[in-house]
Curated annotation (Swiss-Prot):
NCBIfam families, sorted: nuoB_fam, PRK06411.1
Main location: membrane
Note accompanying the cofactor annotation: Binds 1 [4Fe-4S] cluster.
Keywords: 4Fe-4S, Cell inner membrane, Cell membrane, Iron, Iron-sulfur, Membrane, Metal-binding, NAD, Quinone, Translocase, Transport, Ubiquinone
Organism expressing this protein natively: Agrobacterium fabrum (strain C58 / ATCC 33970) (Agrobacterium tumefaciens (strain C58))
Protein's recorded name: NADH-quinone oxidoreductase subunit B
Amino acid sequence: MGMSQNNSTLVAPQPKGIIDPATGKPVGSNDAYFTEINDELADKGFLVTSTDELITWARTGSLMWMQFGLACCAVEGLMQASGPRYDMERFGVAPRASPRQSDVMIVAGTLTNKMAPALRKVYDQMPEPRYVISMGSCANGGGYYHYSYAVVRGCDRVVPVDIYVPGCPPTAEALLYGVLLLQKKIRRTGTIER
């Protein structure tokens, strides 16, 4: 039963996986019964997909951001991007006040040596998966104050940064583009680990 005898050696049948390596689709997906069920569900508003794709889709469409505003970029760039003209919420990105409810931290402004431990503490309070957008020249590399003794030359020395948004101050379009790139990165990686 299921075993074949070949030169006095018992050989088990080749195990079948869930995904067919030739097509990349689930085994049996070309079955007429499966196709019929899929066609019946298509016109009723149902979607047949994998759990991983569903979780990734939900994660990209419901990012909650908080700002770590240190200087002018926090006021100028984020307020403009959140206003009615650009409206970041239509892209599935909504503001939150607490790091424990946030997925994305937007660091905007000059990070000083005194504020670096606070930035790390806030970052550590965020739940996994967490992402960081560095916004503006000062957060990216120190900006005008790069050679000051009191300035950290980029917030990536304190927390891992996923997206860099250049500019002094960056435009609202640049910030929105950074958010869209982050959503694309989440869709591409699809896992909690970076």
